[in-house]
């Protein structure tokens, strides 16, 4: 899954991750450091399949502010929850795509940092030692919101090994994620074709103005070019961009997601 729950749990630093040919990282155990405690297997979410149940209630949510709604990839539910947590002195952990070549989870504690987490990121994020940070915040009584994929939420909960009243988790509907290496390869593909794009402007899902409604959601590969007065994004329909086409068709997901 790549949630790094095992790495965060190992007190002997016996686990490292190595990349396969597609850039997906898999755990490798250093047998000289390993003491066979079994903790890595215990916290692995693969060994704890979630209980399936039907929710008693289901809600459709959008933020009230149309300006805020337009800045979010979907309805802004995660943004609304994050605002509440930050307003009460809590912290939020979520995926940031500000550095598109290293999409990763970050911790924010101020409202002005919220834009770091907005937008859809169709790539596996690097969790690093996020779980350790979260446990530290929980132990001192901070309210924590963690937003991630179902695998990442599952990894966090098995890592913590107990429920916390001050932890809120929000996962999202996910059908799989490509690796960071594949995303970087696609950026390099455009550069080799002579497209001088602004990497910090790349988007996979955006909202465009519409004649029939306030906006419509479009999927594809959107970016700004490094040209004077380039304020209108160039776009490739998802079926014309190799990365987005492979993502939509599920052609290059991690083996555990097939």
Task: Give the positions of each predicted feature.
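Iron-sulfur-associated redox domains of electron-transfer enzymes in respiratory
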Residues: 51-257
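Short, charged amphipathic alpha-helical surface segments
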Residues: 32-33
């Amino acid at each position: 899954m790549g949630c790094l729950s095992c790495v965060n749990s190992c007190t002997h630093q016996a686990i490292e991750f190595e990349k396969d040919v597609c850039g997906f990282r898999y755990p490798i155990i250093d047998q000289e450091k390993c003491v066979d405690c079994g903790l890595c297997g215990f916290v692995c979410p693969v060994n704890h399949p979630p209980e399936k149940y039907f929710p008693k209630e289901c809600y459709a949510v959008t933020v009230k502010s149309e300006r805020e709604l337009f800045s979010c990839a979907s309805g802004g539910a995660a943004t609304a929850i994050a605002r509440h947590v930050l307003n009460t002195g809590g912290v939020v952990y979520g995926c940031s795509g500000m550095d598109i070549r290293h999409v990763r989870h970050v911790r924010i504690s101020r409202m002005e940092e919220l834009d770091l987490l907005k937008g859809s990121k169709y790539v596996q994020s690097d969790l690093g030692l996020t779980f350790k940070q979260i446990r530290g915040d929980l132990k001192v009584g901070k309210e924590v919101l963690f937003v991630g994929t179902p695998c990442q939420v599952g990894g966090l909960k098995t890592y913590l090994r107990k429920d916390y009243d001050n932890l809120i988790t929000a996962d999202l509907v996910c059908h799989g994620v490509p690796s960071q290496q594949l995303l970087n390869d696609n950026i390099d593909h455009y550069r080799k074709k002579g497209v001088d794009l602004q990497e910090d402007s790349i988007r996979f899902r955006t909202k465009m103005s519409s004649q029939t409604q306030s906006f419509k959601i479009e999927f594809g590969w959107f970016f700004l070019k490094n040209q004077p007065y380039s304020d209108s994004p160039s776009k490739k329909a998802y079926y014309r961009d190799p990365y987005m086409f492979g993502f939509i068709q599920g052609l290059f997901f991690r083996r555990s997601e097939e």
